Each structure stands twice: as structure tokens, then as C-alpha cells.
């Protein structure tokens, strides 16, 4: 384990030398704001994925990263494990394609809302719709 020696990016390219005919697995990383400017201010996490297609076929997510703020996240986890868990779930939902919503009762609201620490009905509806998307085993 330990800190990776290369720069972590949200769009990870294939690494056939390391993973053969598979895409690189999702990477969960601890980063500082200096390493990832997206973690500025109160931002505790960031996620992104790489979506690809075969020709004109559907775009599917094949890999990605979740970055957690190395300076802020441990304190949140110590003070409120449910809040920390909610942050991770929020970022994992971004990883698979959900975007922010305006509804403060949903975990995908852009700001942490006290007491909202798990997926709510709207989040689950969005995840369900994403799960009904096409599968492209050739990728």
C-alpha cells in the first residue's frame, strides 16, 4: 500500500501491461488540494469516470477514480462515521454517472446536509435507471 507514484487522474487509460484485456480497476485515492485542485474549499471528495463506446454504440463507463481529501476526510470520519460513509456513497454515485440534484433530501445534493447519509428515493431511482443501460461486453 502507500501513496501512488504517479499522478492520479479521473480519466484513466487502459493499462494492458498491468491488467491484460481488462480496464484498470476503479481507484480510490487520498489527495490534497495541491495534488487535486478540485478538492478546494469545503470539497471533501471528487469522482470521475471514463466512458467509451465502440463506434456509434452506446457510451459505457469502464473505469474511474474517487478522490477523498486527505486533510479533511479523516476528521469527518472520526467525528461522524455516517457522514463520511455518505460522502463515499455520494462520490461512488458520481463514478457511475449520477449528477448533483437540487433536492436537499437526496444524497446527491452538492452540499452535505445534516442527517442525509444514505441514498434517498431519488438517488435510488437514478441509480436504477443507470443500471438499466446497455452492457457492452466487447469493451
Task: Map each language-model feature to its residues.
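Metzincin-family zinc-dependent endopeptidase catalytic domain
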Residues: 1-87
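Metalloprotease/metallohydrolase-associated module, dominated by Zn2+-dependent proteases
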Residues: 49-83, 99-139
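Active-site recognition of the HExxH zinc-binding catalytic motif
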Residues: 86-98
